[in-house]
Amino acid sequence: MAKKALVNKAAGKPRFAVRAYTRCSKCGRPRAVYRKFGLCRICLREMAHAGELPGVQKSSW
C-alpha cells in the first residue's frame, strides 16, 4: 500500500500542471497505471479475473 500522505498529495491540484501524476484509485500505486481504468496493472488484473470490469476478458488465440 502507498503512504497516505503521498496519496493525498497526488489527489490535490499541483501548482504546476506538469507535476500532476496518476495513481491507482484502488491501492495508490504510482507506477504502471492504466489511464483508461485508473488502476495499476496488478489491480486491473485482479479485477479482470474476478469479472468486476465490464467488457474486459482474458485474451486467447
UniProtKB/Swiss-Prot annotation:
Pfam family, any one: Ribosomal_S14
GO biological process, one term: translation
Cofactor: Zn(2+)
Binding site for Zn(2+): 24, 27, 40, 43
Annotated cofactor note: Binds 1 zinc ion per subunit.
A single Gene Ontology CC term: cytoplasm
An MF annotation (GO) of this entry: structural constituent of ribosome
UniProt entry keywords in alphabetical sequence: Metal-binding, Ribonucleoprotein, Ribosomal protein, RNA-binding, rRNA-binding, Zinc
InterPro entries assigned to the protein according to its UniProt record, in alphabetical order: Ribosomal_uS14, Ribosomal_uS14_bact, Ribosomal_uS14_CS, Ribosomal_uS14_sf
Family label: Belongs to the universal ribosomal protein uS14 family. Zinc-binding uS14 subfamily.
Complex formation: Part of the 30S ribosomal subunit. Contacts proteins S3 and S10.
Function: Binds 16S rRNA, required for the assembly of 30S particles and may also be responsible for determining the conformation of the 16S rRNA at the A site.
Protein name per its UniProtKB record: Small ribosomal subunit protein uS14B
